[in-house]
């Protein structure tokens, strides 16, 4: 499926060549779509199995990011969980875990609903993806690398109609449609597990 017919012909043979090339293209697209669906289903099942029975919030957050970031080619990630604010009438987002996170002491990081992209996603319940970030916005750092990500995706995690958490991932590449679909579907499973932990 990696080749096309490339002969110089006219008439009926040209039509036949064009039809064959069209069929090859369709078959190639169908095969690729099938691979993406297999990848999606396999990884959703793997994460579901991995999260099953988890009762510790911090362990869940760390495990999720450790497995999720490399799978979707993210080099950095954080997860914030929703909790009651001090006045109990408001909800806020508390930093739970990070993956290659540069941000200092996690327990000190709290965001209000509507504050920054993470807070906005929590307030609206809608995924936000930003591509081609300006230089200097946030940095992905390692011993050899200090680079701005190309794409950031912020995903609401909900159980029924309640926001339970927000996951933010940054990548040096743009997130693909398949990765985005996977993250959206996975967020529902994460919401169920977070609700179960909260209830126990």
Where are these regions (language model features)?
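A short, aliphatic-rich beta-strand micro-motif
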Residues: 150-158
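Short, charged helix-helix connector/hinge segments
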Residues: 1-8, 12-15, 46-49
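Signal-transducing coiled-coil linker helices
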Residues: 50-64, 174
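Amphipathic alpha-helical "output/dimerization" segments
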Residues: 15-22, 26, 159-162, 174-195
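Signal-transmission linkers at sensory-effector interfaces
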Residues: 22, 29-53, 196-200
């Amino acid at each position: 499926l990696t080749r096309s017919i490339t002969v110089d012909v006219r008439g009926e043979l040209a039509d036949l060549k064009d039809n064959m090339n069209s069929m090859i293209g369709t078959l190639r697209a169908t095969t690729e779509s099938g691979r993406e669906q297999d990848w999606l289903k396999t990884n959703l099942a793997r994460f579901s199995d991995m999260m099953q029975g988890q009762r510790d919030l911090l362990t869940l957050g760390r495990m999720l990011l450790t497995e999720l970031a490399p799978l979707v080619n993210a080099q950095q990630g954080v997860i914030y969980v929703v909790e009651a604010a001090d006045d109990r009438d408001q909800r806020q987002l508390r930093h739970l875990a990070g993956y290659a996170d540069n941000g200092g002491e996690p327990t000190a990081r709290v965001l209000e609903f509507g504050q920054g992209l993470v807070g906005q996603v929590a307030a609206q319940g809608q995924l936000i993806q930003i591509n081609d970030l300006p230089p200097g916005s946030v940095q992905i750092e390692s011993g050899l690398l200090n680079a701005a990500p190309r794409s950031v995706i912020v995903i609401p995690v909900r159980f029924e109609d309640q926001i339970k958490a927000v996951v933010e991932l940054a990548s040096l590449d743009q997130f693909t449609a398949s990765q985005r679909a996977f993250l959206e579907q996975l967020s529902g499973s994460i919401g169920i597990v977070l609700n179960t932990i909260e209830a126990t």
